[in-house]
Structures are given as C-alpha cells and as structure tokens.
C-alpha cells in the first residue's frame, strides 16, 4: 500500500471531520455505536472500527453539525449508507434488521464449511 493511501486509511473516523470534532462525538456518545451498541471502550478492535455517521447523509446535503452526527461502527455505517430516513429511529431499525439478516447468512455459510 502506498504511503499516501496508508495515510488516508489512518486519517481518522471521518474524512469530513477533524479528529478533535470526531472525539467530541465519540465522547458525547460514550464511544458506543448508536445503531448496534458496539462499545469502542471495550477493546482496541472495537475502537478501531468506530466512525462518525451523518444522520442525514453528507452526500445528500447533511450538515456537519453535532445534532446530525452520531458514533457508528463501520458495519452499521455501511449498512445505513446514503439513504434518507424519516427518523433516526427508522435508520436504527433498518440497520438492526439488515444486521440480523446478514447474521443468518453468516451462520449458514459457516455451517456449510
């Protein structure tokens, strides 16, 4: 991996926020994923996958304000994607439903080996 790509990988939890702002979000949310509850304080691996999620996606005009940002683990952030939801609760329900669907796929694939 080139040095420039490597530096982007370790650039921080969001390309749109400073590390300081991301840390404010993490502290406010107690280092827990809003969607699944993964605790980033539990171990290094959990902490490593924490990101900052734009509730109303940045790509769709969402602001970088504190009330539009939540702590999310990478899997939940990817599942939520750039969709727009009626509420944060609707987004959470969508993410948790998809995670459960994927859990069943995982279990079937592992069982088949």
Model-derived features: positions:
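A boundary/linker detector
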Residues: 1-20, 38-40, 92-113
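Basic side chains
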Residues: 5, 28, 80-83, 103
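Structured catalytic/translocation cores of nucleotide/phosphate-coupled proteins
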Residues: 9-12, 48, 52-53, 64, ...
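Short, intrinsically disordered, charge-biased short linear motifs at domain edges
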Residues: 16-24, 56-63
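Short cysteine-rich loop/turn motifs with clustered Cys
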Residues: 17-50, 73
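Generic macromolecular interface patches on structured domains
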Residues: 35, 43, 79-83, 101
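Histidine-centered nuclease catalytic patch
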Residues: 40-71, 84
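A contiguous, mid-protein "functional segment" used to position or interact
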Residues: 69-93
